[in-house]
A protein has these predicted regions:
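NTP/phosphate- and nucleic-acid-binding module
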Residues: 1-90, 97-652
Length: 652
C-alpha cells in the first residue's frame, strides 16, 4: 500500500491500515490533534481503513473540515446530554454550521438555566471519553432500529432514503445517532464548549410542520479561542439591528399590525428620507426621469409579464379568480408599470436610452418564518429603476448602473463589505424561465465580460436568476453571517417582447429594445438595518437623525443655546437643545449614550464671545471654536457626506 501525503512524501505499508494509525506513524502529536482526513479529495473518518494507492491529507481543527467534524461531534454530545436529562425528548437533526452547531429536539422550550444544566452534562460525557463507533444497517433494519428507540424524526429521514441505501450510525456510550459523519474518534478531544441559545425551528424548515426546540452551541480546541468567540458574539448582539434599532427608536413592530410590517419611527424616517433625497437627486443628475405608479394592478398585467405564472405565490392577491370579475394584486416590483410609461408615446432610436426611476413601495408575501427585523419584510421601499435601451447601448448602460451602485456603497462606507454574484439560470429546470437557452447563455456571457472588464471579483450562482434574465447581485452579510442581496442589476432581453415594446430605428423599422432592471441602493429598510449593524448606531454625521445637541451649563444660558440651535437649523443641521435643569455631566453622558456626533456646551464665556465648547465622538473634547466656524465645518461635512474616523475610544 502506498500513501502520498500533502507535502509530496510517500508512506508504504504491507497491509491495510486505519487512517488514525497512519497519522500515528507520521507523528504522535499529529494523531492527537487530528480530526478527520481527506482521502483522494473526500473527507473521511480517521477510523477509515485504506488499502492500495491513495493521496492522504490529515486534517486538524485548523481546517474547515476539521472544525466541522469537531463541532458535529459536539452536537452528538449535546444530543446525548439532552436524552440523559430529558428522556422524553425526540432527536431531529444536529449539523455543524459556521462557527458552531445546533441540534433540533421535539421537547419543551428551554431557558438559560436549563442550557447550563445540559452544558454541565456535556462536560461529564466528554470526561467519560466514549469512543465513537460507526456501523451500518440496511434501510429496513435501520427503520426498525430507530422505531424501537422511539425516534420518529430519524425514522422519517431514513424512509426518505432509497430502498437499497446502506444507513450509517454513530454510537457513543448509550447514545446512537443516525449520521453520515465524519466524526472524531471519541468525545475526549472536545475541550471548550458553550451552549449559546435556544429558539424555535420548524421541522424541515416548513411552517406547516411542528415547531421544535433548537439549541445552538459552539466548540473550540482552546478556551482562549472560545472566550474570544463569545466576546465577538456579545459585540454582535450589541450591533444586531433588531435590538439596537429599537433601542435607538428607529423602528418597531406591533403584533396586531403583522409580521414583516415594521413601523419606521421618526428617527428612522429621517435617515431613510435623507438617503431617498440623495439617491433621487443623484439619479436625476445621471439622466433618470421620475415616475409615480400605482401600488396595485389587475392580474392581467402580471399575466403579461409572466409574474402570475412564475411569482404568484410571492404576491398579495386581492380577490378570488373563481368568483370575482377583476382580481388585483399588490405590486411586487415596478417594472411592468414603467413599461407602460415607455409605451405611452412612440420612441425613436434617438430617444433611447430612456431611464426611469421611482422610489417604490413594494409588497412581497414572504413566509412568516423568514421575517426578521428590517432585513426580511413584506412591505418595503426601494429606489427602483428601469432603463429601456438599444442593444448597442446595453453594455455601457449596464456598466453605468454598476458604477452608480458602487458610488452609493462608497458614499455609505459599505463598499468593502459586499460580494458580487452573477446569478444565472438553471438549465436543468428550464420550466422556471422564459426565453431560449441561447439567449440566456449569451446574456450571461455579456455580464461575465462586463464584470471581468471592470476587474470586479465575482462568483457564479446557478439557479439564482429571475425568470426573465440573469443579473448581478451585490450581497452583504449581517452580523450573524447570513447573506442578503442589497442591490440587483439585471439584464433583460425578453420582456420587451412580452409587452410589445419597440422603438423606430434609423430605417423606420420597429425594433425590440433591451431592458435593465436595477436598484441604486436597494431596499431602504434593509439598508437601514445594514447601516445600524455596520456602524453600531454611530452613523456618519449626514445620516444621523440628531446631528448636534446644544447643552447650556445652566438655565441662564438657555436663550443663547436656543439661538445657537436656530442658526444650526437654518443651515440645514439637525440640532436640538437639552435645556433641562440637569448637571452638565449628566447631559454629556446622555448625549453620548444617544450617539450624538457633536455636543456644543455653552456658558458665559461662549455667550460673550459667540463661541461654543465642542465635544465630538470623533476627537472628544475639541475646545472652544467660533460658532460660525463650526457651522461652516459641519455643513461641509454633511454636504460631502464625509465619514469621519473615530479617534477616541471613549470621550473624556
Amino acid at each position: 500500500m502506498k500513501i502520498t501525503l500533502k507535502d509530496g512524501s510517500c508512506k508504504e505499508y504491507a497491509e491495510p491500515m486505519a487512517i488514525i494509525d497512519i497519522a500515528k506513524d507520521i507523528s504522535e502529536g499529529l494523531a492527537r490533534v487530528a480530526c478527520v482526513a481527506e482521502l483522494d479529495g473526500e473527507v473521511v473518518d480517521l477510523r477509515t481503513v485504506v488499502d492500495g494507492e491513495h493521496e492522504l491529507n490529515i486534517l486538524t481543527f485548523d481546517s474547515d473540515a476539521g472544525k466541522a467534524a469537531y463541532r458535529h461531534t459536539a452536537s452528538h454530545v449535546l444530543a446525548q446530554a439532552v436524552k440523559r436529562l430529558y428522556p422524553h425528548a425526540k432527536c431531529a437533526i444536529g449539523p455543524a454550521i459556521e462557527d458552531g452547531f445546533y441540534y433540533d429536539f421535539d421537547m419543551e422550550s428551554l431557558d438559560r438555566e436549563a442550557l447550563d444544566k445540559i452544558e454541565k452534562e456535556m462536560k461529564k460525557i466528554v470526561k467519560e471519553g466514549a469512543e465513537l463507533k460507526r456501523f451500518t444497517l440496511p434501510r429496513n433494519e435501520a427503520i426498525e432500529f430507530m422505531k424501537k428507540r422511539e425516534e420518529p424524526y430519524k425514522v422519517e429521514l431514513i424512509e426518505d432514503l432509497p430502498e437499497d441505501a446502506e444507513i450509517s450510525f454513530y454510537e457513543q456510550g448509550e447514545y446512537v445517532d443516525l449520521c453520515a459523519g465524519p466524526h472524531l474518534m471519541s468525545t475526549k478531544p472536545l475541550k471548550a464548549m458553550k451552549l449559546i441559545s435556544s429558539s424555535g425551528a420548524y421541522w424541515r424548515g416548513n411552517e406547516k410542520n411542528k415547531m421544535l426546540t433548537r439549541i445552538y452551541g459552539t466548540a473550540f480546541t482552546k478556551k482562549a479561542d472560545l472566550d474570544a468567540h463569545l466576546e465577538h458574539l456579545a459585540d454582535i448582539k450589541k450591533r444586531d439591528h433588531n435590538k439596537l434599532g429599537r433601542e435607538m427608536e428607529l423602528f418597531t413592530t406591533v403584533d396586531v399590525i403583522g409580521q414583516g410590517l415594521p413601523l419606521i419611527m421618526p428617527n428612522g424616517v429621517k435617515m431613510i428620507q435623507r438617503m431617498q433625497r440623495w439617491i433621487e437627486d443623484e439619479e436625476t443628475k445621471r439622466g433618470y426621469m421620475r415616475t409615480k405608479t400605482p401600488l396595485m394592478a389587475k392580474s392581467d398585467l402580471y399575466k403579461i409579464s409572466g409574474h402570475w405564472d412564475h411569482y404568484k405565490e410571492g404576491m398579495f392577491v386581492l380577490g378570488d379568480e373563481d368568483k370575482d370579475k377583476e382580481v388585483f394584486a399588490l405590486r411586487p416590483m415596478t417594472c411592468p408599470f414603467q413599461y407602460y410609461v415607455y409605451k405611452a408615446s412612440q420612441k425613436s432610436y434617438r430617444d433611447l436610452p430612456c431611464r426611469y426611476g421611482e422610489t417604490s413601495t413594494l409588497f412581497r408575501n414572504e413566509d412568516s418564518g423568514e421575517m426578521h427585523g428590517l432585513t426580511r419584510v413584506r412591505q418595503f421601499t426601494i429606489s427602483e429603476g428601469h432603463l429601456i435601451v438599444r442593444p448597442d447601448q446595453m453594455v455601457k448602460e449596464f456598466k453605468d448602473c454598476i458604477a452608480l451602485a458602487q458610488y452609493c456603497l462608497q458614499t455609505l462606507g459599505l463598499e468593502e463589505d459586499v460580494t458580487y454574484h452573477l446569478s444565472k439560470w438553471d438549465p436543468e429546470n428550464p420550466e422556471k424561465y422564459i426565453g431560449e437557452p441561447e439567449v440566456w447563455n449569451e446574456t450571461e456571457e455579456d455580464i461575465r465580460n462586463i464584470l471581468n472588464e471592470l476587474n470586479i471579483p465575482f462568483t457564479e450562482d446557478v439557479g439564482e436568476a429571475a425568470f426573465y434574465g440573469p443579473k448581478v447581485d451585490i450581497n452583504a452579510k449581517n452580523v450573524y453571517g447570513k447573506e442578503d442581496t442589497m442591490i440587483t442589476i439585471q439584464w433583460d432581453a425578453l420582456l420587451a417582447d412580452q409587452f410589445d415594446m419597440y422603438y423606430i430605428d434609423e430605417k423606420g423599422d420597429k425594433v425590440r429594445p433591451y431592458i435593465i432592471h436595477r436598484t441604486s441602493i436597494g431596499c431602504y429598510e434593509r439598508t437601514l438595518a445594514w447601516l445600524i449593524e455596520k456602524y453600531a448606531g454611530m452613523f456618519p454625521t449626514w445620516l444621523c437623525p440628531e446631528q448636534v445637541r446644544v447643552l447650556p451649563i445652566s438655565e441662564k444660558y438657555a436663550d443663547y443655546a436656543e439661538n445657537v440651535c436656530q442658526k444650526l437649523t437654518a443651515n440645514g443641521v439637525d440640532a436640538t437643545v437639552d435645556n433641562r435643569s440637569e448637571k452638565i455631566g449628566f447631559k454629556i453622558r446622555e448625549a453620548r449614550l444617544h450617539r450624538i456626533p457633536y455636543m456644543l456646551i455653552v456658558g458665559q464665556k461662549e455667550q460673550e464671545e459667540n463661541k461654543v465648547s465642542l465635544r465630538s465622538r470623533y476627537k472628544g473634547d475639541e475646545g472652544q471654536v467660533a460658532l460660525d466656524d463650526f457651522i461652516a465645518d459641519i455643513t461641509e461635512e454633511i454636504r460631502t457626506k464625509e465619514i469621519r474616523k473615530i479617534e477616541v475610544s471613549e470621550e473624556k
